């Protein structure tokens, strides 16, 4: 059994978590299985995200309104979309707020890393698609209230070779945390860094006493 489950078996118990996957991934991502294992008493919902950003955000907003999740977790591109899903507690892991730039070196045929319900297994990254994302990401960080700042956490790998948006995020949200790791949300990162943040959110939702955020950050950032 995962040691975190032994220590906190009721993490998000009875609650619903919505997961928003990254670029070239799907709802069949191994991250979905990992999150479900970490929170066995929670309901995890995830769907394949459309390739075009306008279609994607429309689908995600409708999904959030329908599912009414207690927490939304987004990784990479999914973290970028998650920032826009206001009104919910949210965790953004290595959010790709500069998708246009990130995709600029990926032009041409790309294969999806996980199977999708629509059966599509490859994607053509064109200059037009890159422009769609570059234009779309200008919507990020709009109309942020103090209440929203309290509901959003950002986790950023200190050795991420793909995304470098810590400073950009921290300009708008105070709860920005560096972790020792790269771009992918692997088990070790989830155990040492993501789960403690989920627990803070869970405790806050349950009305339990919280330790100071500064000490929280310090404890997480120095976990090995």
Functional labels for PLM-detected ranges:
Residues 19-23, 73, 155-157:
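Short hydrophobic segments within beta-strands
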Residues 2-13:
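Short beta-strand-to-loop junctions in surface cap/lid or active-site-entrance loops
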Residues 11-66, 183:
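Active-site catalytic motif of lipid deacylating hydrolases and related acyltransferases
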Residues 89-209:
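The alpha/beta-hydrolase serine catalytic core
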Residues 70-73, 89-91:
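Residue in the alpha/beta-hydrolase core beta-strand immediately N-terminal to the catalytic nucleophile
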Residues 73-83:
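Gly/Ala-rich beta-loop-alpha elbow adjacent to hydrolase catalytic centers
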Residues 211-224:
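Single conserved hydrophobic/aromatic residue that forms the stacking wall/gate
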């Amino acid at each position: 059994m995962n040691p975190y489950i032994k220590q906190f078996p009721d993490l998000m118990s009875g609650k619903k978590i919505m997961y928003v996957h990254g670029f070239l991934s799907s709802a069949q991502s191994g991250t979905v299985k990992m999150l479900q294992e970490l929170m066995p008493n929670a309901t995890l919902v995830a769907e394949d995200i459309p390739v075009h950003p306008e279609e994607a955000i429309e689908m995600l907003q409708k999904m959030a309104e329908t599912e009414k999740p207690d927490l939304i977790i987004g990784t990479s591109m999914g973290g970028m979309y998650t920032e826009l899903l206001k009104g919910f507690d949210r965790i953004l892991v290595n959010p790709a707020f500069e998708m246009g730039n990130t995709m600029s070196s990926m032009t041409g045929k790309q294969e999806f890393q996980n199977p999708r319900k629509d059966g599509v297994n490859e994607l053509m990254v064109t200059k037009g698609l890159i422009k769609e994302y570059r234009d779309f990401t200008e919507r990020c960080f709009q109309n942020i209230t103090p209440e929203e700042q309290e509901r959003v956490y950002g986790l950023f790998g200190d050795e991420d070779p793909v995304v470098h948006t810590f400073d950009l995020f921290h300009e708008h949200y105070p709860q920005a945390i560096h972790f020792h790791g790269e771009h992918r949300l692997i088990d070790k990162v989830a155990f040492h860094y993501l789960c403690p943040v989920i627990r803070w959110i869970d405790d806050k939702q349950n009305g339990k006493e919280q330790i100071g955020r500064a000490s929280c950050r310090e404890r997480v950032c120095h976990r090995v």
